[in-house]
């Protein structure tokens, strides 16, 4: 329980940071009341989890790759369940074999980045994202 509490607290803080970042156009996290599955998550979960996805402004594939490459604490991975913070770029990883049109229709746009937020110090994680995004 202690571990999940830390995951969720970190995800909440990172989601709020991303939401206020001028270089980010969309943030997906079920703790936001405007998230399409917020009520389901509220009913089924004790908290809102540690999975976050976000889209950069202008939906730039190359910019998303640059962000991933600049991350120092978040590790590039397709796995999503450890105590460490992980980042992935679905358009070039898990969904790379899906035709772009089909992929984008399902919401996996070119600049979508998926995070599995770990239990590291949240200020360090936010600083890492900030330096990678800017």
Give the label of every model feature segment.
Residues 10-11, 71, 91, 119:
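Generic short alpha-helical hydrophobic face used as a protein-protein interaction/packing hotspot
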Residues 2, 12-72, 76-81, 99-104:
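Conserved small-domain helix->loop->beta segment predominantly found in fold-type I
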Residues 9-12, 16, 20-23, 124-134:
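Well-ordered, non-transmembrane segments within structured domains
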Residues 3, 58, 85-134:
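PLP-dependent enzyme catalytic core of the Aspartate aminotransferase-like
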């Amino acid at each position: 329980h202690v571990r999940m509490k830390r995951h969720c607290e970190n995800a909440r803080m990172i989601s709020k940071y991303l939401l206020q970042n001028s270089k980010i156009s969309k943030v997906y996290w079920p703790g936001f009341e405007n998230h399409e599955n917020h009520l389901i998550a509220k009913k089924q979960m004790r908290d809102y989890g540690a999975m976050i996805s976000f889209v950069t402004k202008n939906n730039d594939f190359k910019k998303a790759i640059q962000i991933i490459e600049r991350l120092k604490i978040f590790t590039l991975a397709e796995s999503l369940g450890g105590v460490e913070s992980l980042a992935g770029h679905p358009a070039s990883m898990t969904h790379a074999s899906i035709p772009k049109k089909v992929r984008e229709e399902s919401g996996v746009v070119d600049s979508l980045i998926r995070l599995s937020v770990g239990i590291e110090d949240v200020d360090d994680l936010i600083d890492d994202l900030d330096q990678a995004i800017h």
